[in-house]
Amino acid sequence: FFQAEDGIRDVAVTGVQTCALPIFCLTDFMRTVADILGAKLPDTAAEDSVSLLPALLGQAQNSPIREAVVHHSINGSFAIRQGDWKLELCRDSGGWSAPKPGAPAAADLPPIQLYNLASDIGETRNVQAEHPEVVARLTKLLEKYVADGRSTPGAPQQNAVEVKLVKGPVRGAKAANKKAKGN
């Protein structure tokens, strides 16, 4: 896993029809497969999963299937994507791609990165300084997800461990550096 833009940018082919899939992640396969099998999952299972089955069947969606997607890298770094915005709470890739965690090339990079994927799919222009309101909004949403122990509707869940959203010191982003503990 790495923090580079992680969504799927293609269409699904279902028979002779095509459908644009919503942004999804690996966790969504749990609820999707459960829906395909007609299985009911308990509220305490697959807390971050949503079913893609309606989209795969070509059913019209009146609203996004999820509010945002949370990414968690191999080294524990977080990112959150909502619409065209992606907020990365790390100064490196968070995983195997360059710059790798701890690499000298990452030392001088900002600890918070914000990208507008509509205009910068390659994530080459960090716009966090120009959009502090987006940084604050996405940070607050991520903090809510951590506090709730889930990113989908349902009863709050306990986190297995204390969650620190940002690893290491952050200059000028107190909200993003807060520790959030599950209920």
What are these regions (language model features)?
Residues 7, 35-37, 127:
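Short alpha-helical scaffold segments that flank and stabilize functional sites
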